[in-house]
Regions:
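PLP-dependent aminotransferase class I/II
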Residues: 1-146
Length: 146
């Protein structure tokens, strides 16, 4: 509708600040969660890229001996929102049963994403205090820096 278009156009004026806030939040999480790299694979930008981050993707390392679900339940206790990555290994989805398809390789990385990865937010409205709370709870879960 015209009203939705007007709202969208008004948001366009704020786009650069939204993108910068997402980048700043991503960098803040990345820098501060280095304390947990023994347990987690943290995201990083592809060389020569300049992403506007959707979220902060975290992967629990297999050698951490921690199940993703346990970390997610812990974060949920503190009202920290998380989301699973969209698909992971599509060949493991119920829809694919009984269908003919071709696979190139073992798809082991897609299994890792499906089983061990999740997002936390980098929404532009998050404050440093909010991000610090998320970081503190992740560090507490792993027994780091507290």
């Amino acid at each position: 509708t015209e009203m939705q278009a007007a709202c969208g156009l008004a948001q366009m004026d704020k786009l650069d600040s939204f993108i910068q806030a997402r980048k700043d939040n991503f960098k803040y999480l990345r820098d501060r969660l280095k304390s947990c790299e023994e347990f987690l694979i943290l995201p990083e930008a592809t060389e020569n890229s300049d992403p506007s981050w959707f979220g902060f993707l975290i992967t629990v390392k297999p050698e951490a001996n921690i199940r993703r679900v346990d970390l997610l339940k812990y974060l949920d206790q503190y009202k920290i929102g998380t989301r699973l990555l969209f698909a992971g290994n599509l060949t493991r989805q119920p829809y694919m049963r009984g269908r003919n398809y071709r696979v190139s390789g073992e798809l082991s990385n897609t299994d890792v994403v499906m089983n061990d990865s999740f997002w936390i937010g980098v929404y532009p409205g998050l404050t440093k205090e909010m991000l610090d709370f998320v970081i503190k709870k992740i560090e507490e879960f792993f027994g780091v820096n507290f």
